[in-house]
Amino acid sequence: MKQMSSAQIRQMWLDFWASKGHSVEPSVSLVPVNDPTLLWINSGVATLKKYFDGTIIPENPRITNAQKAIRTNDIENVGKTARHHTMFEMLGNFSIGDYFRDEAITWAYELLTSPEWFDFPAEKLYMTYYPDDKDSYNRWIEVGVDPSHLIPIEDNFWEIGAGPSGPDTEIFFDRGEAFDPENIGLRLLAEDIENDRYIEIWNIVLSQFNADPAVPRSEYKELPHKNIDTGAGLERLVAVIQGAKTNFETDLFMPIIREVEKLSGKVYDQDGDNMSFKVIADHIRSLSFAIGDGALPGNEGRGYVLRRLLRGASMHGQKLGINEPFLYKLVPTVGKIMESYYPEVLEKRDFIEKIVKSEEESFARTLHSGQHFAETIVADLKAKGQNVIAGQDVFKLYDTYGFPVELTEEIAEEAGMTVDREGFEVAMKEQQERARASAVKGGSMGMQNETLQNITVESVFNYNASQLPSKLVAIVAENAEVEAVSEGTASLIFAETPFYAEMGGQVADHGQILDATGNLVATVTDVQKAPNGQALHTVEVLAPLALNQEYTLAIDTNRRHRVMKNHTATHLLHAALHNILGHHATQAGSLNEVEFLRFDFTHFQAVTPEELRAIEQQVNEKIWEAIAVETVETDIDTAKEMGAMALFGEKYGKEVRVVTIGDYSVELCGGTHVGNTSEIGLFKIVKEEGIGSGTRRILAVTGKEAFEAYREQEDALKAVAATLKAPQLKEVPHKVEGLQEQLRQLQKENAELKEKAAAAAAGDVFKDVKEVNGHRYIVSQVSVSDAGALRTFADNWKQKDYSDVLVLVAAIGDKVNALVASKTKDIHAGNLVKELAPIVDGRGGGKPDMAMAGGSNQAKIQELLEAVAGKL
């Protein structure tokens, strides 16, 4: 077996499959593009779903890739096992309706065992297969595998919901008896026992059925086009080839671990407790790549995953004695390890470091809050005479504040308590099940549409024409190809079309189809790309249409021009965001509609009003400069030399279309645009909002819609001016400031009156002093307008020695408000109010000297008042 670096292993994989006629697909962003079903790209095939379900026919049916992926379902196992990771690379080879089982198995065996390639010892390889899949069993024997190395496994059948499915055959490497201390042998494989001896290095899925959850597997229909989908984990291959005990002792992780050794002063011991080193090395890889791809830490979705990874790694740093931000210092090391295939980490190093360091500093503050929460839990339990921290509280400390359960156990031990480990595990399992359910939901592929896949006639889109004659070359009605159609809805393909098919965030053209005499025969309501790339016109048929006849296709030019204005404005907006917010503000999604444009972009905070104004101003300046908008068709390398901005994660062909707006904007784009920015007229941002962690959205309008938006604002301002009796619009702010000053004065006078009234009422309330167990206390229901008045009562009470404890309750609206104040260390106001609040179906808390509560059951106020004495 050859000795190779991880970079050499990755490249050898790609070179082998390229030699077998495969196109090498570059790794795409971890953040899915146009796939809302996925939180992350979680496999090599995730980016190829459109090919497997037949939505798009690839230029080459043979594809290979090395794809970065993230899975966090088993995050708790990272560092505990030899092979679990949150981010990993999946090597794959794929056949979309081309070769199948025989070639897939033959070539897999060649790549692994040939001296020209990996040169694995054949006797070290074992294969599992689906028991009913005799063809795979026979093929393995034909290529030279000993039958005793073939293990039938009932679970070797791949399916996730409806769509492509089929048997799979897995390849394992035997690391020998040293990794099988109980000498269990092949039972480890046959009975699927977790082990470190037989390492799965490759899974070959033979996708030959359309899975249908409504019928038994035996009734699945054969796919019209059978596929091959394989995956080999690079980290596992590297560990086997480099003879490493675990994946972490390879050149993918050890440079990171060495840096952690320097930062911590601790030494990584392969045979000792090295979990913290492993977790840090794993998590910083995920953080570096995900942030580089535009995901940012936050409280939901992808952002929550990243925040959890960072906090976990940070806590493990503390275990190693690193008590300051340090993860950001590891980013360059990650970048250097992966530079040969993933240069983007080093290219975006400064931005990634900035985000990681900022998040580390934020977590330090959160840890302090978590410490306070833990102390509150301990104090409450002591007050109740209890000594077990509930599982849900342990989980909240873990999930919200980043406390490992071990840290909570240490806090509990110091307080003479224990934690409910079982309850914590239940809460953790519930979260994992939710994550797995979410992952399964996003994994299914759609059913293949055989009719559309089989239509291979050519169809050309004419960018410059708004109307042209063209031959009708395909008609699909009721999911079948037909010769003619006379009514209803149908899908049509023409030899040439002026209709733009929805793509790249630009909506489809609408329009009309006319016959040779100029009569309207159909209206076009939508245009989408067919699997083989043709424009598929969805039409409402008004008169008979026949195959191979010529018709006139006419787009709605007014609609097209309005969309074009919005699309060109989107390019201007993208450039302005780069200039004003920074180059990290890249496109995360867009929609160019008839009446508006919507643009999603990566940014880690809300855009300020000043920034929005500057962005809007810059876009309008470029519109008023009347810059020519030009398009150039060229190859991808030339486009990059031109400085064309490509959307990371999008796939581009050999020939691309570059849209330039002077030297202000250069982007790869297949959409339609105005000829000059002056045609846009006017640009106005109408809304900016967050739509997820690290992602912002701008809604804007152009032309007539922008003018109407300004007019609407002007009308509203005029209405305000009329109400304020301001003769000129510019006087409105002054008038409003005057009203605000009057309001502040009235509020001040009102507060003073309330204080006087409260002081007068307090005189009566504070006279009724009672005593129990040596504690003087006052308890009373008072009539006040808001909770603030209760605090005023308490402030007056503090001024004199009326009593040791004060309890006030008020019915305000349909709610109950309560206040507890204490001057004695024996009575903790926060704890007392927590005991009283449930009586009125409420909850509360606070400090030892003052606390508040709210409730909803006013009928129980008297019961609460009577309960006070028993609590003191």
Curated annotation (Swiss-Prot):
CC terms in the record's Gene Ontology section: cytosol
Ligand binding (Zn(2+)): H567, H571, C669, H673
Pfam families in the record: DHHA1, tRNA-synt_2c, tRNA_SAD
Compartments reported by the entry: Cytoplasm
UniProt EC number: 6.1.1.7
Key words, A-Z: Aminoacyl-tRNA synthetase, ATP-binding, Cytoplasm, Ligase, Metal-binding, Nucleotide-binding, Protein biosynthesis, RNA-binding, tRNA-binding, Zinc
Catalysed conversion reaction: tRNA(Ala) + L-alanine + ATP = L-alanyl-tRNA(Ala) + AMP + diphosphate
Alphabetical GO biological process terms: alanyl-tRNA aminoacylation
Cofactor binding mode and count: Binds 1 zinc ion per subunit.
Gene3D superfamilies in the cross-refs: 2.40.30.130, 3.10.310.40, 3.30.54.20, 6.10.250.550, Bira Bifunctional Protein, Domain 2, Threonyl-trna Synthetase, Chain A, domain 2
Source domain of life: Bacteria
Phosphoprotein in keyword set: no
GO molecular function: alanine-tRNA ligase activity; aminoacyl-tRNA deacylase activity; ATP binding; catalytic activity, acting on a protein; transferase activity; tRNA binding; zinc ion binding
Database matches in PROSITE patterns: AA_TRNA_LIGASE_II_ALA
Role played: Catalyzes the attachment of alanine to tRNA(Ala) in a two-step reaction: alanine is first activated by ATP to form Ala-AMP and then transferred to the acceptor end of tRNA(Ala). Also edits incorrectly charged Ser-tRNA(Ala) and Gly-tRNA(Ala) via its editing domain.
Alphabetical list of HAMAP family matching this protein: Ala_tRNA_synth_B
Family, per entry: Belongs to the class-II aminoacyl-tRNA synthetase family.
PANTHER family linked to this entry: ALANINE--TRNA LIGASE, CYTOPLASMIC, ALANYL-TRNA SYNTHETASE
Domain notes: Consists of three domains; the N-terminal catalytic domain, the editing domain and the C-terminal C-Ala domain. The editing domain removes incorrectly charged amino acids, while the C-Ala domain, along with tRNA(Ala), serves as a bridge to cooperatively bring together the editing and aminoacylation centers thus stimulating deacylation of misacylated tRNAs.
Protein name as annotated: Alanine--tRNA ligase
